[in-house]
Amino acid sequence: MEKLLCPSLLNLSMDYLKDEIMRLDVSGADILHIDVMDGHYVPNFGMSFQDIETIRKNTSLKLDVHMMMYNPGRYIERYAEFGADIIYIHPDSETIPTETLCRIRKLGKAPGIVINPGISLDSIQELLSLVDYVLVMTVNPGFAGRDYLHFVEPKIEQLF
């Protein structure tokens, strides 16, 4: 399993977008991480379709979209259209996560799942064969700057 450097753009100033992305391009980043939120699954909002489109126009790096929202399947076509290469869903945010993951792949994008700190690996074991990426949250989702949760580290080790 490969380890990748995927800096988050959550706190990126759109005023300095081009400069910041250029710096990330030459910094050795593998993938740029974009958080999108609906204000319900988590009590916050992230980047828009237009933000992703603008980021895509300014980099050739892969873009991953972390969908912190209920029923993300409603929007995967749009995120794919606007430039996402990898689309992460939270399995508990979707009624039938297997269907959404398969739809992501049919769009030619890489499906991924997110494991929140309080979720056991056993609960997502069946989904691992359907995804190319796993995002293990070491903070509670929704806001930047939250405290690192050390108890999650064994989950990361178990995945490797």
Label the predicted regions:
Residues V114-G118:
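Short gly/ser/thr-rich secondary-structure transition/capping motifs
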Residues M1-Y88, S93-I96, R103-P111, L121-V131, ...:
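Conserved N-terminal beta1-alpha1 strand-loop-helix module at the mouth
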Residues H90-D92, M137-N140:
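Short beta->alpha connector loops at strand-helix junctions that form conserved
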Residues D38-G39, V139-F143:
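A short, flexible beta-alpha/helix-coil linker loop
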